[in-house]
C-alpha cells in the first residue's frame, strides 16, 4: 500500500522568523502520525536554516523549491544540491509550473535537475507536470502531461524511480481557487501510472507516489485522496497557515 504524502509549498512567502513560527506550530501538532502519512514543508531558501532547526527531531521532512543542476560555478542566484543538503533538505520540488513560466525552465533543464539530484542523497525529488487551460480546452491534457513525464524522467533508471514523486498540477488550478474535479484528477493520475508501467514496470507503477496540486484545501482533500491513483497533495496557499494545513492533514488521517 502506498503512503500518503502531503507537502506544503510556501513559495515566496515568509521571512525566516515568520516561517519558524508556522513550522513550530505544525511540528508540535503532528507528533503522532500514522506510518502511512508523510508530512513535508517547503519554505523559501532563506528560511531553510531556521525551519530545519524548528522541525529537528520531528517526523516532518524539509524540502526546497528548486535547485541548479550544476554543483558549482558561474550561476548567479542559483543554489546547488550540496548547498541544500547542508541545511538538511530531504526533498526538492522540480519543474513547478511557476518555474517553467517565470524562469523559462524547459523539460530538458528539468530533466538535468532530476538527474543531478539523483546523484545526491535526497530522499525524494518531486517532478511537477501539468497542462494550461488552453491545452485542456484543446483536448491535449494527456498528451502534454505524459510528454512532460517522459522528458522529465529521461535516463532515470528503474532503481532510481523509487526516489521520484510525481505531482500533477494543472496550471489553470494553481492559485486560482479552481480545482480539478476528483474525476478529472483521477483520469490524469491513472494515465500517468500507466505511463510509468510502460516506461519501467508494473512494480514501479504500483509503488510510485503521484500527488495532486492545485487549490487543494480542507474541503476537497479527502475526496481527492479517496481516488485510487491519487497518493497525496502538493499544497500551496492552504499550507501557509498552520491551522489550515493541519486541517488538511486531519481530514486525510
From Swiss-Prot:
Source superkingdom: Bacteria
One protein family per Pfam: TIM
Primary enzyme class: isomerase
Major localisation: cytoplasm
Protein residues bound to substrate: 9-11, 175, 215, 236-237
Reaction equation(s) it catalyzes: D-glyceraldehyde 3-phosphate = dihydroxyacetone phosphate
Self-association state and partner proteins as the record states: Homodimer.
Sequence similarity: Belongs to the triosephosphate isomerase family.
Function (record text): Involved in the gluconeogenesis. Catalyzes stereospecifically the conversion of dihydroxyacetone phosphate (DHAP) to D-glyceraldehyde-3-phosphate (G3P).
Protein name: Triosephosphate isomerase
Organism: Borreliella burgdorferi (strain ATCC 35210 / DSM 4680 / CIP 102532 / B31)
Amino acid at each position: 500500500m502506498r503512503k500518503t504524502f502531503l507537502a506544503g509549498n510556501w513559495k515566496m512567502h515568509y521571512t525566516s522568523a515568520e516561517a519558524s513560527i508556522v513550522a513550530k506550530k505544525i511540528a508540535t501538532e503532528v507528533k503522532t502520525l500514522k506510518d502511512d502519512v508523510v508530512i513535508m514543508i517547503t519554505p523559501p531558501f532563506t528560511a531553510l536554516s531556521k525551519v530545519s532547526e524548528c522541525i529537528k527531531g520531528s517526523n516532518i521532512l524539509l524540502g526546497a523549491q528548486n535547485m541548479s543542476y550544476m554543483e558549482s560555478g558561474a550561476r548567479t542566484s542559483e543554489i546547488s544540491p550540496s548547498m541544500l543538503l547542508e541545511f538538511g533538505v530531504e526533498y526538492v520540488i522540480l519543474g513547478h509550473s511557476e518555474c517553467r513560466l517565470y524562469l523559462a525552465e524547459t523539460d530538458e533543464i528539468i530533466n538535468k535537475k532530476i538527474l543531478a539530484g539523483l546523484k545526491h542523497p535526497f530522499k525524494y525529488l518531486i517532478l511537477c507536470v501539468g497542462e494550461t487551460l488552453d491545452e485542456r480546452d484543446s483536448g491535449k491534457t494527456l498528451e502534454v502531461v505524459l510528454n512532460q513525464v517522459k522528458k522529465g524522467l529521461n535516463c532515470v533508471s528503474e532503481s532510481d524511480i523509487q526516489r521520484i514523486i510525481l505531482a500533477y498540477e494543472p496550471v489553470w488550478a494553481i492559485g486560482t481557487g479552481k480545482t480539478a474535479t476528483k474525476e478529472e484528477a483521477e483520469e490524469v493520475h491513472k494515465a500517468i501510472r500507466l505511463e510509468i508501467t510502460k516506461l519501467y514496470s508494473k512494480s514501479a507503477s504500483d509503488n510510485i507516489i503521484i500527488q495532486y496540486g492545485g487549490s487543494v484545501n480542507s474541503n476537497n482533500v479527502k475526496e481527492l485522496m479517496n481516488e485510487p491513483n491519487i497518493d497525496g497533495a502538493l499544497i500551496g496557499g492552504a499550507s501557509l497557515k498552520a491551522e489550515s494545513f493541519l486541517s488538511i492533514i486531519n481530514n486525510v488521517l
